[in-house]
Amino acid sequence: MTIPKSSTGQSYPPVLDYRIVQLIGGGGFSKVFRAVNPSSESHSVAAIKVISYAPNRSNKYPIDRRALQKEVQVHSILKHPNVLEFLGAVERGVDKNGNAGKEKGILMGEAVATTKESIRARDKERQQMLSSPSHDQNYVPGLYMVLELGAGGDLFDKIAPDYGVEEDLAHFYFQQLLAGLEYIHSQGVTHRDIKPENMLLDAEGNLKIADFGLCSVYKYKGKERELTGACGSLPYIAPEMNGKPYRGEPVDVWSSGVVLFAMLVGSTPWDEPTSRSPEYSAYRTGKLFEYDPWPRIPQDALSLLKKMMHPTPEKRITFEGIRRHRWFKRANDLMTQKGKCNDPVNLAEKLLQGLAVSGDIIVEVNGAAAAAARRLDLHSDGQRAQVPENVSLTQPDAILTSSFDLAARAVARGWADDTGPGGGLPLPSSTAMPAFASDDMSRRLAMSQHISSRRAEFSTTASGSGYDMALPGASQFTQALNHFTQFEALTHVAGTGSSHLRFSPHLTRFFSSASAATILALIIDVLDRLAVLNAHQAIGDQEELELEEAYNFMADGEPETTVPSDDSSRPTGGSKRLLIGSRGARIRLKTMDRRKCVLRGEVYVENLAAPDSTSDSASAPDRNAAKCLVVMKKGKGDPLEWRRLFREVCRRPEIMQTIIST
């Protein structure tokens, strides 16, 4: 595999014996890559976070070198099962004195290593630098942090928006979140950016707290200092972060309370904790508890949430108080005595069942499960039953309108030209909404049952054809996620294209019976209708699927028009010239979510069909044959909001009718 290069022709170097192989996220100053080190006994696959020191037109503010230095110093000393492990850090393309036109580094030329393996690699690289001082002159200048890979992906990628997860799952992950936070604070550190985007899963489904870029040391040798400066994401920050001094523990307690709320109901309670938010104002008066989704929250959990999100920090519950709360102390069959997942396959099954019942994933249903679904759908006279959608009765009709449309959004949220019963409190923005309007509840239940029925197959299938447990990062949890949702027709396209996308922790994906060209055109049309900035590029045989220059490594501006990447690119018709390569295409997109936060990522349309069948036939397409795979990969933003955008794409009738499985 070719080592990727930046738009300046500079390359990304080996880092502490790790070789960069795949871009997996990021934006602005930083990008995150997957990296491999086959000789490592503990982490053969890792993540490398690269913070560029190179000037870029899209970077409006200079890099905060002191903050970077603090992030490395703090994260490198944190060792806990629920904290993403820091393996090491090096700088490349820099000079500790700023000589030779290079940027001045923050590590003063010295690599940071925290494990025996990374220490050995650091010493080896040090010898190489002594023997060849100019060996890194053509590397992308920046800080390279080697981190544990969150092989299970984002936790909230597996939680249905406006639905949430069952109480035991929320309790399991909240216990792990609190364990990690208690440890962090025991070291005198406050995270200050607890949100879904910074909650990853390891290969066994356990939670890992990530990203210490906004952390601060607030306690040292028993002495505590107050902090200043608002930071984090508005829906999750504490109300006292308003420019005045605040304490370190209460702000993380508040943010973890909002995260718990989001796990239970699939939405944040407000846009921001200020008087500008009608929801937060209603929360302070107590009126908000009358409206969905608050009544859906179990009473003990609600009791804890109220204590964690008390507007007055002095009256807010502490971490110690949370641990004594009756909801926190409830038994949980998913967890070992040491606080880890005791059955990764069961955990994957429960997460997927929630997505199936909410309608956020589509699973190919056949055999007994399909027959059961048909029986549920029919009355005794053989006529189809009218199965109502599981929607709040207070939800306005506008829910079927695009949630990304600004005009419709105000009405759908209930804050424009709509009020609650009797002209009272407007409808909360987090009221429930159906995922796929054309789907019915009986089929959703059948899909959930089908996921359970496939568990018996997993132990034998996982080691058989199509499931390589020896793949880097493969585990029972990650393989179960794919096995339970995989459709049988996939075996007909095995070996075509690049399979690493098919077997990944990303659940914002679907297999389609339409051609890649058709789906590409439809997705771009949906994004245009939603006013989502987007640009696409063809992917050809001569390119690595996720590493070619089209990423414009440090570009964080608006998506730009791209050119064909090879001779296989061709227009697909329509008003806009669409580019589709022999392997498919990639769409880069950027928008603002409904909480006014940046949402950025890419959509991959991978061609699975034979070379001579890349377009839709005039005859009826084979409904069971997958012609393309679509994967939406979030780069930056709230995972719940990313899944909402995925939902919007899938709702398009022309796309929905081609979806075989997700």
Curated annotation (Swiss-Prot):
Residue stretches making up the Protein kinase domain: 18-328
Keyword Ribosomal protein: no
Start-end of Polar residues biased regions: 562-572
Compartment(s) of residence: Nucleus
GO function terms (MF aspect): ATP binding; protein serine kinase activity; protein serine/threonine kinase activity
Catalytic reaction equation(s): L-seryl-[protein] + ATP = O-phospho-L-seryl-[protein] + ADP + H(+); L-threonyl-[protein] + ATP = O-phospho-L-threonyl-[protein] + ADP + H(+)
A matching Pfam family: Pkinase
GO annotation terms (biological process): mitotic G2 DNA damage checkpoint signaling
CDD domains linked to this entry: STKc_Chk1 (cd14069)
GO cellular component, as recorded: cytoplasm; nucleus; site of double-strand break
Keywords of this entry: ATP-binding, Kinase, Nucleotide-binding, Nucleus, Serine/threonine-protein kinase, Transferase
Catalytic activity, EC: 2.7.11.1
Described function: Serine/threonine-protein kinase which is required for checkpoint-mediated cell cycle arrest and activation of DNA repair in response to the presence of DNA damage or unreplicated DNA. May also negatively regulate cell cycle progression during unperturbed cell cycles.
Similarity field: Belongs to the protein kinase superfamily. CAMK Ser/Thr protein kinase family. NIM1 subfamily.
Protein name according to UniProt: Serine/threonine-protein kinase CHK1
Lineage, top ranks: Eukaryota, Fungi, Dikarya, Basidiomycota, Ustilaginomycotina
Gene: CHK1
